[in-house]
């Protein structure tokens, strides 16, 4: 879940009228409404109640993520120490790297407990920065898409919630101000780009879409949510399998729980 506990200065395409400080009442109401179904929530740790909210969500079994923030290095470190285990789409919607104002990115990559998300579409994050991210945090990068409803659809005009967006060349921007408003990326394409365009090993590319995100939620071992562990082709793991054409890195067949779906 992204929002509503985000920094106004890094809101991206989020409606500023909906942004809130995560006071205990809001946290408790959200946890009650989710009824155990909330897995991850992005929080700007510099908000007045940001660190306390991270602790509260973590104590409830939710994985807090640092993102959509303008946090300095020390505040981001406090967020991770309080229980945040993920950085939401690194480089996007946060203050960037600076040698005198390091910000949240070094805090995430220095902490071995933190899984670092990346949107590998060549647009949200340019290829040199994707490679830099993998160098920063080897075996801790998780591919995410930030995809919205126009994914796998033609270019044109769409709605993102109540917001008008335009999709041009597969890139999504708000019609009002041109701000990036999600993506049309699929995980298949993210892995494909990593291998064919960035030169990553198949192991590193596939791991970023499977085992690493599974580890972030504790799904790489027996757990009450998925029951069988996820993320590997190994005895005892869920029989969820993709068959990929190695020449073009496109998915050809899909099995879920050992049943052929495609």
Predicted regions, residues:
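Glycine-centered positions in the ABC transporter ATPase nucleotide-binding domain
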Residues: 257-258
